[in-house]
Design a protein with these regions (language model features):
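Family-specific signature for flavin-dependent thymidylate synthase
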Residues: 1-165
């Protein structure tokens, strides 16, 4: 392939040729991050379902809590000092409730209703480099939620590392 031409096209945002190249990623992130990312068009999504997988639920607890942005409806700013014990205790309680329901014979598709947005989920995400480029341009920006931005940055770095496309 003509590497110079490919880099030129990417640099100048001539993305249509990248609609013919595909990539797939295995992603693990909290449910609340997954729900933001699933909205991107033209990317195939296959999430691992608790209906079929009996693994023990894992939960995301942030190291740093952020304050609410004063100048936007969404977003965050600054750091708030608060213990993560509440989130850890809630996750542990939800896990116990989930296991209790399963022990009662409740089907997994109903028992999972007690699991919180902080539960980790995994999915396989495939699409064209053009579609991933569009997702990264939107989700790597500084006004994106930090946890979502982290996933987008990791995908962007992996694409760069593989010299697929430089976003």
């Amino acid at each position: 392939p003509d590497t110079k031409l490919i880099q030129y096209l990417a640099k100048h945002k001539h993305m249509s040729p990248f609609g013919h190249c595909f990539a797939s990623f295995h992603v693990k992130a909290p449910v609340f991050v997954a729900r933001q990312l699933v909205k991107h068009k033209f990317l195939r999504w296959n999430e691992i379902s608790r209906r079929y997988v009996d693994s023990e639920p894992e939960f995301y607890v942030p190291d740093v809590w952020r304050g609410r942005s004063e100048d936007k409806k969404q977003g965050s700013s600054g750091k708030i000092t608060v213990s993560s014990d509440l989130a850890r205790n809630m996750a542990e309680s939800a896990k116990k409730d989930y296991e209790y329901l399963l022990d009662l014979g409740i089907c997994p598709e109903q028992a999972r209703m007690v699991l919180p947005q902080s539960m980790m989920t995994e999915w396989y995400w495939s699409g064209s480099l053009d579609a991933f480029s569009d997702m990264c341009l939107l989700r790597c920006s500084s006004d994106t939620q930090a946890e979502t931005q982290e996933v987008a940055n990791q995908i962007s770095m992996k694409m760069h590392e593989l010299s697929l496309i430089h976003i």
